[in-house]
Amino acid sequence: MAAEVIAAAITDIELMKASQLGLKGIAAALAVGLTGLGTGVAEMSIGSAAVGATAENKDIFGLALLFTVIPETIVIFGLVVALLVLFS
């Protein structure tokens, strides 16, 4: 009788740990996925404007490249958050 109760408690603890790991995985995927989606939407308008401006004036290529790279740092922040969630 006591062994069955202990076995049930151990099974419940294992299920809670597995559920927690699954939720951590979902949170990490959302962190990277949503930041990637947001960056893609931002790059859509910034990239086309940068290419158009560079086509008109070749001297602003460096500035256009800088404005194109800035939104990509958002994905790096999402990746850092995902790693913190997974390994905490």
Stretch-by-stretch model annotation:
Residues M1-S88:
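Hydrophobic, small-residue-rich transmembrane alpha-helices and their short perimembrane loops
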